[in-house]
Every structure is written in structure tokens, then in C-alpha cells.
Amino acid sequence: MGWSNFRDGRCKSNIHEDVPGLACINKLKPVTYKLEVKKLDQFLGRKDSLMNTMQPGYAIAEKKIHTGFVAQDVEKAAFELHYDFDGVNHPQNDKDNYSLVYSQFVPSLVKAVQEQQLLIEELKKENENLRHSVTALQASFEKLKK
């Protein structure tokens, strides 16, 4: 059984369909990066004895390439959209770090797909109308040629 979050509608109020879709997704900057694990441990104030024990693992961990987002970039994108996004965990003090809750990106991704689908449907209609116009123009042209 996978991870689940409490989402029962019977215990929710003040529900609004105001999640930004494409506007939010288009502001995000997917990146690849190497995590500086030792630097993170130092920043978080991990004890030297623990860091010495973990020393052999640092080199391996720091070679791995990760894919994701920079939390501060996500925070900036949400701020620019006036979106109170709950997918960014902000530092609680000067020795805490930013983190992201990737599952909270799903509503914006769903909204973006819905918005794209509406655009696709509009373009299909426009394309069909243009095809009819071209067919009518071709028929008129053929009549003029005779």
C-alpha cells in the first residue's frame, strides 16, 4: 500500500478551484544538480563525530546527479503568482533548510493538463473551421476555372 494523505471532502471547508496551472508550471525551472551532502550536514550543525563516520559515504553521495527544483526558485514562482503554495517548507530558524513536498505539485500539474486540453480542443475546432473554409475556397476556385 502506498503513501496517502488525508483528503476527505467531508472535513473540508472554504474550497476554491483557484490552483494555478500552466502559469505556475511554466515558471518552474527543472534542474539537475549534485547535492553537497557534507555542506548540508555542516549547515544543519551535525556533530563532527557523525560527520567523520559518514565521511566515506560523502564522496559517493556527492557524485550522484539529482533531478528536481531549487526550493527558493519555487517559492519565488509562487510569490510572483500570489499563490500560497504549500509545497515549500520554509526554514524555521537560521540552522534549518528549505525543502519541497513534491506531491503538492500534483494539483497544479493536473490543472495545467486541463488547461492544455482546453487549448487543444479550441485549436481542433479552429483547424476544422479552416479546413471547411479551404474546401469551400477550392470548390469556388474549381467553379471559376470551368
Annotated model-derived regions:
Residues 21-61:
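Acidic, glycine-rich loop-and-strand cores that form catalytic or ligand-binding grooves
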Residues 10-14, 58-64:
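Active-site rim elements
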Residues 18-24, 70, 109, 133:
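Stable alpha-helical elements in mature extracytoplasmic
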Residues 46-58, 85-146:
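C-terminal intramolecular chaperone/auto-processing assembly modules
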Residues 68-69, 99:
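Short aromatic/basic micro-patch
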